[in-house]
From Swiss-Prot:
It comes from Staphylococcus aureus (strain NCTC 8325 / PS 47). It comes from the Bacteria. Coiled coil: none annotated. This is NH(3)-dependent NAD(+) synthetase. Belongs to the NAD synthetase family. Pathway: Cofactor biosynthesis; NAD(+) biosynthesis; NAD(+) from deamido-NAD(+) (ammonia route): step 1/1. GO terms for biological process: NAD biosynthetic process. Pfam families: NAD_synthase. ATP binds at G47, I48, S49, G50, G51, Q52, D53, S54, T159, K188, T210.
Length: 273
């Protein structure tokens, strides 16, 4: 293992193997402890995309909220559907929601807000690319979740995990923004393992991962966008050997996107060297 890989493995906290029952218990306890430590929290808010990550986090949150209520703590889980117009994988979103069984479902179509933002920028002489418009979608989705959380005395739960964090494969202040990120420390295959253990439909955790933000490239697989497979990323995070080409791609993503893993730099925190 190279020195940089060792540093990254330590930072990303991924275990070489996990016990599903123990891991789920730890994840639920983290969520519950956070809520119990902040008496103002009356709701937890999460956007549901129909993919592996939001399905897993949604199920964990609902299980945690159920236990909190049994312990006398008043708390609600709000699952949010955030389509941009008509969502191509809407059936999978509904399948995920049936599995999660959230207390409450809110649907907000982000298309009018995103299109107006893009148009307003265009009128100001700023013409966004399709990729940049995709980031607008991600930020609008997170803005809506924080608005709901503010209205309902809640917090926003994120879906960031270590296979995503290492590559910076998320929108800064978009899907990368949240109050808590329960599944950080898991890689992609471990997330699948937990969903299988929880009895999720195979379609939800065997689905090809995609951010699906670009109009010109609908359902673009994450692995195509990243230039490396999740299998390689997972192996790297577990301290296993990968090919030199895979190592270079992963480490380049890690270095280039370091700013996404930090709050705004100050003159005291900017790593100049």
């Amino acid at each position: 293992m190279s020195k940089l890989q060792d540093v990254i493995v330590q930072e990303m906290k991924v275990k070489k193997r996990i016990d599903s029952a123990e891991e789920i218990m730890e994840l639920k306890q983290f969520i519950k402890n956070y809520v119990q430590s902040h008496s103002f929290i009356k709701s937890l808010v999460l956007g549901i995309s129909g993919g592996q990550d939001s399905t897993l986090v949604g199920k964990l949150v609902q299980m945690s909220v159920n236990e909190l209520r049994e312990e006398g703590i008043d708390c609600t889980f709000i699952a949010v559907k955030l389509p941009y117009g008509v969502q191509k994988d809407a059936d999978e979103v509904e399948q995920a929601l049936r599995f999660i069984e959230p207390d409450e479902i809110v649907t907000v179509n982000i298309k009018p807000a995103v299109d107006q933002s893009v148009q307003s920028l265009k009128e100001a002489g700023i013409v966004l690319t399709d990729f940049q418009k995709g980031n607008e979608k991600a930020r609008e989705r997170m803005k809506v979740q924080f608005s709901i959380a503010s209205n309902r005395q809640g917090i926003v739960v994120g879906t960031d995990h270590s296979a995503e964090n290492i590559t910076g494969f998320y929108t800064k202040y978009g899907d990368g923004a949240a109050d808590i990120a329960p599944i950080f420390g898991l890689n992609k295959r471990q997330g699948r393992q937990l969903l299988a253990y929880l009895g999720a439909p195979k379609e939800l955790y065997e689905k090809t991962p995609t951010a699906d933000l670009e109009d010109d490239k609908p359902q673009l697989p994450d692995e195509d966008a990243l230039g490396v497979t999740y299998e390689a990323i997972d192996n790297y995070l577990e301290g296993k050997p990968v090919t030199p080409e895979e190592q270079k791609v992963i480490e380049n993503h890690y270095i280039r996107n370091a700013h996404k893993r930090e709050l705004a730099y100050t003159r005291y925190t900017w790593p100049k060297s």
